[in-house]
């Protein structure tokens, strides 16, 4: 593999560990790290968190959050290569303490000037070789030659990106299977949930359920307006067609609800700027076991709670956004192997900072 390649995103592969940094998200960030460690440690996967003082592995119970200049989205800044090197976006104020990383993992670190953020591409196994899936918007801010130089001899396949980065919209698994957010599937699931809630309410006249129905209808109107304004359905349809044309197995899932903002991100189209995510189950960590089964770790959304979808009500009407996401993966990932991590505080922080679990962690492959 070429030393010129800087990539952070993988399809589902066996992991040795995942690495993140204390980017100033507070105590609840460590709670998310601890939950993730509890899940992945059972699979033989370690979770590393870098603080301003040291790197801690797996046990975060006694940590007191401290201020740091660390950039929180490690996925976009740091890459653990299969050729046993680490590459960083640059030795900037947000990328201090790289020496600690080098010593912890006994790997050399290399600075990359011509950097492409890891959230906008994935390496995918295709016929035993790695190819690159790259968000097409990179072509608007980088020259094709610089992109090819960046990825070396590897084939680069550009894809339409409905969102700021590809890892916010798709999640590659293994065997060329790719989860793709599907707004139409989400809307169908929401409609069915509203229908069942109305049927139960007609029998029970439960005031809590009445409030849930009202909130679900409001959310539906909000999603429809957003889909129309930003042409969401056509964007995802185009992406799915591109993947199918290139012989990927597209698995549609109801994994994302966006609330586009009005800000501007340098070098990015306006429609993708300052996006907020009411729910994002796409931006996830996936570990492949020896038997090829998968463990899926996504960030928990506060949306179900905000809608009043308690476990009891969700069971009664057979609907919540976590439930319909799990159901969409029947026969692909076992329900007990799909996890949603984080508390209300960190979920809101991630939602308001335009990222989620995959953005937080850099994956360390088994060498």
Describe each PLM feature range:
Residues 4-367:
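Histidine/cysteine-enriched polar flanking segments
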């Amino acid at each position: 593999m070429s030393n010129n390649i800087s990539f952070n995103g993988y399809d589902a592969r066996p992991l040795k560990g995942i690495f993140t940094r204390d980017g100033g998200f507070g105590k609840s960030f460590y709670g998310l790290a601890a939950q993730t460690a509890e899940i992945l440690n059972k699979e033989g996967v370690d979770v590393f968190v870098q603080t301003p003082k040291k790197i801690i592995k797996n046990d975060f119970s006694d940590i007191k959050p401290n201020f740091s200049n660390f950039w929180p989205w490690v996925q976009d800044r740091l890459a653990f290569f299969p050729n046993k090197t680490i590459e960083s976006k640059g030795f900037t104020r947000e990328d201090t303490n790289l020496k600690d990383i080098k010593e912890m993992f006994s790997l050399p670190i290399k600075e990359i000037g011509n950097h492409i953020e890891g959230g906008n591409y994935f390496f995918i196994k295709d016929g035993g070789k790695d190819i690159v899936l790259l968000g097409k918007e990179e072509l608007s801010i980088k020259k094709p030659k610089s992109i090819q130089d960046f990825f070396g001899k590897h084939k680069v396949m550009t894809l339409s990106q409905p969102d700021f980065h590809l890892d916010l919209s798709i999640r590659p698994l293994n065997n060329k299977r790719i989860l793709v957010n599907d707004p139409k599937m989400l809307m169908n699931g929401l409609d069915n949930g509203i229908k069942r809630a109305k049927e139960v309410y007609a029998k029970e006249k439960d005031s809590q359920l009445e409030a849930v129905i009202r909130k679900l209808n409001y959310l539906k109107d909000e999603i429809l307006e957003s889909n129309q304004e930003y042409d969401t359905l056509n964007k995802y349809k185009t992406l799915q067609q591109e993947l199918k044309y290139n012989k990927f197995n597209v698995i549609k899932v109801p994994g994302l609800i966006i609330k586009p903002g009005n800000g501007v991100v340098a070098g990015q189209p306006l429609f993708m700027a300052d996006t907020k995510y009411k729910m994002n189950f796409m931006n996830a960590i996936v570990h492949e076991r020896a038997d090829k089964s998968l463990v899926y770790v996504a960030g928990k959304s506060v949306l179900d709670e905000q809608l009043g979808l308690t476990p009891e009500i969700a069971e009664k009407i057979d609907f919540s956004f976590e439930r319909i996401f799990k159901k969409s993966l029947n026969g692909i990932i076992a329900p007990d192997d799909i996890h949603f991590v984080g508390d209300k505080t960190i979920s809101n922080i991630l939602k308001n900072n335009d990222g989620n679990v995959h953005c937080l962690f850099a994956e360390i492959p088994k060498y």
